[in-house]
């Protein structure tokens, strides 16, 4: 039986449904990071206040420019995505997003749905009493926002002893726990708010994770493993394996210095392999970004970099896992018009031309160049400006895509309606340049990486490289020599 997919409201905090974001440094508090599309669909009833734009800081030396460019991007993320540095498993990275529930004919997903329905059958017929009990219980067990009040030493489900709070957001909180039934292993438990819409989103993510974990029980394809889920005092709790920092948080804590080429190669191959697994299972992730790519372990070595005049961290083991399947969509489900976080959003999504698996490939291309540079090449919150940045980096948009789009306000006479001499136009011209000009070296491996990125950033989704093809790209040949 096909169950309905809830309408996604971009004003819900996108990071709130992502396991990845909670794996950041625990020394800072996180702010709420809202979905970048929130400012584009004001009809949603959950309103977020606007913030002012921040501009690229120019400085005298090349090193200073690179550093300030990265700082600009971080400030941009803070301003326009509600990003807050800080706790592992949480908000910017945090992508336990409030997305729609899935509709699929697959028995694995519908069986969970029916099980959940039967479990709450009685309370559904006594909604008034249920809401009264919930409100009353919050004075004892929940805070005013619906978070479960808990502290170190508390035990969930007579099994998971809380040792630390890793992060907190609109969806709930994530805690690190000791699993006393499995030899004291450490796990991450997401405790969802006792609020209907967040519970529904959690159920949607559980369904996808159950399917993926059953299909790949040993995590060969590097999707995060959900160990189990349970209810605790009205809160859905999802138990995950404990992972390291997100790749974004590692870059951020490393002063926005990029990854080494050999690490980029290994990470890129694992990401492509993981997402290709999703695609082969008729799923599109729809929210790939560095915050949703987590290191299995984020141990690092540190040495002084005389060129950058600061200490530089090098990850010891670049193995990764992909997280946050709250927005993953099956081929036969309803496809929301707007998906993906702004920086990683494909042109067919911006132009409302419809999307499928190729939108994930575009996102991966954006991720790889961010790993290479240390910052995103599309730092914007505006669709018209985003398209202008694309044209500056990748050349003119294809005429057939312009002619098909319903977003006519972005175009005039089948060309992007963009004034290069305006302040915004000058900013884009200064901030962006043709793709190959971002190359830091003309060495063969750099050429191969940019060839792969260029194929991933093909405008036309029908011509964009598939991940099955990408895994055979010459950039990955050195990996195959060692296997």
Swiss-Prot record:
Biased composition (Low complexity): 84-111
GO biological process, one term: regulation of RNA splicing
EC annotation from Swiss-Prot or TrEMBL: 2.7.12.1
MF terms (GO), sorted A to Z: ATP binding; protein serine kinase activity; protein serine/threonine kinase activity; protein serine/threonine/tyrosine kinase activity; protein tyrosine kinase activity
Post-translational modification: Autophosphorylates on all three types of residues.
Domain spans labelled Protein kinase: 160-476
Gene3D superfamilies hit by this protein: Phosphorylase Kinase, domain 1, Transferase(Phosphotransferase) domain 1
Catalysis: reaction(s): L-seryl-[protein] + ATP = O-phospho-L-seryl-[protein] + ADP + H(+); L-threonyl-[protein] + ATP = O-phospho-L-threonyl-[protein] + ADP + H(+); L-tyrosyl-[protein] + ATP = O-phospho-L-tyrosyl-[protein] + ADP + H(+)
Pfam families named among the record's database cross-references: Pkinase
Positions where Phosphoserine occurs in the chain: 61, 139
Ranges of biased composition (kind: Basic residues): 26-36, 112-137
Subunit organization: Interacts with PPIG and UBL5.
Protein's name according to its UniProt entry: Dual specificity protein kinase CLK1
Species name: Mus musculus (Mouse)
């Amino acid at each position: 039986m096909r169950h309905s997919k809830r309408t996604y409201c971009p004003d819900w905090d996108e990071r709130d449904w992502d396991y990845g974001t909670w794996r950041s440094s625990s020394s800072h508090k996180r702010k709420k990071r809202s979905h970048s599309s929130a400012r584009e669909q004001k009809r949603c009833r959950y309103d977020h206040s606007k913030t002012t734009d921040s501009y690229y800081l120019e400085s005298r030396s090349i090193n200073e420019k690179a550093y300030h460019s990265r700082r600009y991007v971080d400030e941009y993320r803070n301003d326009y995505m509600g990003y807050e540095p800080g706790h592992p498993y949480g908000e910017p990275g945090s992508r336990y997003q409030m997305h729609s529930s899935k509709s699929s004919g697959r028995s694995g997903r519908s069986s969970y749905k029916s099980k959940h329905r039967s479990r709450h059958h009685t309370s559904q017929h006594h909604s008034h009493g249920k809401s009264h009990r919930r409100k009353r219980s919050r004075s004892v067990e929940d805070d005013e926002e619906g978070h479960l009040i808990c502290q170190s030493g508390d035990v969930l489900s007579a099994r998971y002893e809380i040792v630390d709070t890793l992060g907190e957001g609109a969806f709930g909180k994530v805690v690190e726990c000791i699993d006393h039934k499995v030899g004291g292993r450490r796990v991450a438990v997401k405790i969802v708010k006792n609020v209907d819409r967040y519970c529904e989103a959690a159920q949607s993510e559980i369904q996808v994770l159950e399917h993926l974990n059953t299909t790949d029980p040993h995590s060969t394809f590097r999707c995060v493993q959900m160990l189990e889920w349970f209810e605790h005092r009205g809160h859905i709790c999802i138990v995950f394996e404990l992972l390291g920092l997100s790749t974004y948080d590692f870059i951020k804590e490393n002063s926005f210095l990029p990854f080494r080429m050999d690490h980029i190669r290994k990470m890129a191959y694992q990401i492509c392999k993981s997402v290709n697994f999703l695609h082969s299972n008729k799923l599109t992730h729809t929210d790939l970004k560095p915050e949703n790519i987590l290191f299995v372990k984020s141990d690092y070595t540190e040495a002084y970099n005389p060129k950058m005049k600061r200490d530089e961290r090098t990850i010891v083991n670049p193995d990764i896992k992909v997280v946050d399947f709250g927005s993953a969509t099956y081929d036969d489900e309803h496809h929301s018009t707007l998906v993906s976080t702004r920086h990683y959003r494909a042109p067919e999504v911006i132009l409302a031309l419809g999307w499928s698996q190729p939108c994930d490939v575009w996102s991966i291309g954006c991720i790889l160049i961010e790993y290479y540079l240390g910052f995103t090449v599309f730092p914007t919150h505006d669709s018209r400006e985003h398209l202008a940045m694309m044209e500056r980096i990748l050349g003119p948009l294809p005429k057939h895509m312009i002619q098909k789009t319903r977003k006519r306000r972005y175009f005039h006479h089948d060309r992007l309606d963009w004034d290069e001499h305006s302040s915004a136009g000058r900013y884009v011209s200064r901030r962006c340049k043709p793709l190959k000009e971002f190359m830091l070296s003309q060495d063969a491996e750099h050429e191969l990486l940019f060839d792969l990125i260029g194929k991933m950033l093909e405008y036309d989704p029908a011509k964009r490289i598939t991940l099955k093809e990408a895994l055979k790209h010459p950039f990955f040949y050195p990996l195959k020599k060692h296997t």
